[in-house]
């Protein structure tokens, strides 16, 4: 279920990224009408993605779940697990729309230089999710113990809270967010801009779809190695994602700064700033990787699982730590190419390596 949601989330990100290239450039040359047009285009992309994934999950949801369940997982009640997964997804349908709308607003805010509000809204969503997970999973404060369904409800609530915060703040600060004034007077997108967004955005969407699908296939391969491997992978990925935030945030920084400079026509400055940001990102991620390597034997001890799983998770964390500088370099290069509109090259670079790993 988590991997299916992961594919959906990345497809939303990839789909909106094409319009986001133009958002940053329009904002860089102070063209707020252009920003409004790209925001409207994002709505069509986001809502279309929601409709497509809802259709896929409704028609093929059970088959997608079953791909990660097989007889090789000792001690696992496949029927019960499938039932819990279906119950979870049935509730999670309701988080798709608020998540999509949130990304339309948050991505536009980031591309226009406002990065703090989306972060604060995300933190609020995490806190709401944690609190309601505790209440609804375990039945605290008089609430029923809903287990897996409770976890799904908590996630849905957190998505609505995040969406409400982002929308409310954006519309209350119209002097700062001038693009929001009149954005809903029409939902028309200029045909030429729409064609350019499709031309540049389609490769990004395809790239994210293939990449997330490849990661889901990789995890399906891990699931065939047994529950211990799956548990170790989950621990490793959870911890690694915390440390990866540094590299990922630098990628977004590159997209915003370089995109705005390109929009303002300052090519030489864009090249200079990009080189500095790439170097800083690699240096920062190297330091983060060293810290991660030092903590690799300790962090898995926080989990209530077997010693072999903890050791396997530690080994995976060491590998992830060693790759931190390389991840930072490729991530910032990815956003550099994206901000300059070289989106087709991203598929040529990333997908052959992804297929090699899976094969």
Residue ranges, per PLM feature:
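Transmembrane helical elements of multi-pass membrane transporters/channels
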Residues: 91, 102, 125, 158-162, ...
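Short alpha-helical transmembrane segments in multi-pass integral membrane proteins
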Residues: 23-95, 143-201, 258-323, 359
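Small-residue-rich hydrophobic transmembrane alpha-helices
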Residues: 3-55, 99-118, 232-296, 327-346
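Helix-loop-helix hairpin linking two adjacent transmembrane segments in secondary transporters
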Residues: 98, 106, 121-163
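Single conserved hydrophobic/aromatic residue that forms the stacking wall/gate
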Residues: 1-2, 347-351, 355-358
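Transmembrane alpha-helical core residues of multi-pass small-molecule transporters
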Residues: 49, 124-129, 154-162, 240, ...
């Amino acid at each position: 279920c988590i991997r299916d949601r992961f594919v959906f989330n990345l497809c939303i990100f990839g789909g909106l990224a094409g319009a986001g290239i133009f958002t940053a450039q329009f904002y860089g040359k102070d063209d707020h009408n252009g920003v409004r047009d790209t925001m409207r285009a994002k709505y069509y992309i986001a809502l279309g993605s929601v409709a497509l994934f809802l259709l896929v999950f409704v028609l093929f949801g059970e088959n997608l779940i079953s791909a990660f369940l097989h007889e090789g997982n000792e001690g696992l009640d496949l029927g019960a697990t499938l039932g819990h997964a279906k119950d979870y997804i049935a509730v999670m349908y309701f988080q798709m729309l608020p998540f999509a709308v949130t990304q339309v607003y948050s991505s536009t805010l980031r591309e226009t230089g406002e990065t703090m509000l989306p972060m604060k809204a995300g933190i609020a969503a995490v806190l709401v999710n944690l609190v309601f997970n505790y209440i609804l999973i375990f039945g605290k404060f008089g609430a029923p113990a809903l287990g897996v369904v409770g976890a799904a409800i908590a996630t849905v609530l957190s998505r609505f809270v995040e969406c409400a915060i982002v929308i409310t703040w954006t519309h209350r600060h119209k002097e700062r967010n001038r693009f929001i004034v009149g954005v809903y007077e029409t939902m028309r997108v200029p045909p030429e801009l729409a064609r350019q967004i499709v031309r540049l955005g389609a490769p990004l969407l395809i790239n994210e779809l293939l990449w997330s699908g490849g990661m889901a296939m990789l995890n399906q391969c891990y699931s065939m190695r047994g529950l211990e491997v799956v548990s170790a992978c989950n621990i490793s990925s959870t911890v690694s994602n915390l440390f990866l935030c540094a590299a990922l945030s630098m990628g977004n920084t590159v997209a915003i700064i370089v995109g705005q400079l390109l929009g303002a026509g300052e090519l030489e400055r864009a090249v200079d700033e990009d080189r500095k940001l790439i170097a800083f990102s690699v240096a920062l991620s190297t330091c983060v990787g060293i810290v991660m390597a030092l903590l690799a034997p300790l962090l898995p001890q926080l989990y209530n699982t077997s010693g072999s799983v903890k050791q396997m998770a530690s080994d995976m964390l060491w590998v992830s730590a060693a790759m931190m500088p390389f991840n930072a370099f490729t991530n910032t290069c990815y956003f550099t190419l994206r901000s300059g509109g070289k989106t087709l090259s991203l598929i040529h670079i990333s997908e052959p390596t992804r297929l090699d790993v899976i094969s």
